A protein has these predicted regions:
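Substrate-binding/active-site groove segments that recognize
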Residues: 104-122, 137
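Sec/Tat-exported extracytoplasmic proteins
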Residues: 59-63, 77-82, 92-102, 115-118, ...
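Export/targeting segments at the very N-terminus of extracytoplasmic proteins
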Residues: 38-96
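Extracytoplasmic/secreted proteins, especially bacterial periplasmic and envelope-associated proteins
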Residues: 51, 69, 73-76, 86-87, ...
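Sec-dependent bacterial lipoprotein signal peptides
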Residues: 3, 7-35
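A short, structured beta-strand-centered segment in the mid-to-C-terminal lobe
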Residues: 124-133
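Acidic helix/loop microenvironments that form the catalytic cleft of cell-wall polysaccharide enzymes
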Residues: 96, 150-178
Length: 193
């Protein structure tokens, strides 16, 4: 808010001088800058979602209606938690192959295979519901990245948990293999974009 107030103060100061004719133009530009941001961001999300959807369809043979429906959710959750949307899309490919109804033997559910008994308190709502599931999976991944300090280790944590990774060499190797698989899916998707 400082900038517009300061800007308009300067304009009013010079309104009777040779800067006066520019006041209207400056007001229009400033207004567009502040009101246009939301439409630019929404167009950006729409364009990025469309591009991601096309890539998911090509790279992973996902049906167009599924890719179109999930891509905006992936972009929005990735933006919210500062995760690369291509990485998130690759995690979904690894976890569920874009099938929402998947339930693992361990009880993990949905697209990102979240285990409700561990995450229900942190991620309220129905974790089978696509948006809730993607948002929760993204939150978990971002949290693990902060804890691990790098994405490959965060991916390993996502698969076997930090405790499993740090306490058991077999689990650590399993997590590292998982991270490599996700990174391979990420590479394939990047090539399709």
């Amino acid at each position: 808010l400082f900038f517009p107030q300061h800007f308009f103060h300067l304009l009013s100061k010079y309104s009777n001088s040779h800067f006066g004719p520019f006041k209207s133009v400056a007001i229009i530009i400033t207004t567009l800058a502040f009101t246009g941001c939301s439409s630019i961001n929404s167009n950006s999300v729409a364009k990025r979602s469309a591009k991601l959807s096309t890539g998911i369809q090509k790279a992973y043979s996902v049906a167009p209606n599924t890719a179109d429906r999930l891509s905006p959710m992936i972009i929005q959750s990735a933006d919210k938690y500062n995760v690369d949307p291509v990485l998130l899309a690759a995690v979904i490919r690894q976890e569920s192959s874009y099938r929402n109804s998947v339930i693992s033997p361990a009880g993990a559910v949905g697209l990102t295979q979240v285990i409700p008994r561990y995450w229900q308190q942190t991620c309220p709502g129905d974790l089978i519901e696509e948006y809730n599931n993607i948002n929760c999976g993204t939150y978990i991944l971002a949290s693990y990245n902060i804890k691990a300090g790098n994405w490959p280790k965060a991916l390993a944590y996502y698969n076997v948990g930090p405790t499993g990774y740090n306490s058991n060499n077999k689990m650590k190797k399993q997590g590292e293999k998982y991270a490599e698989q996700v990174q391979q899916h990420q590479k394939i998707l990047k090539g399709a974009l």
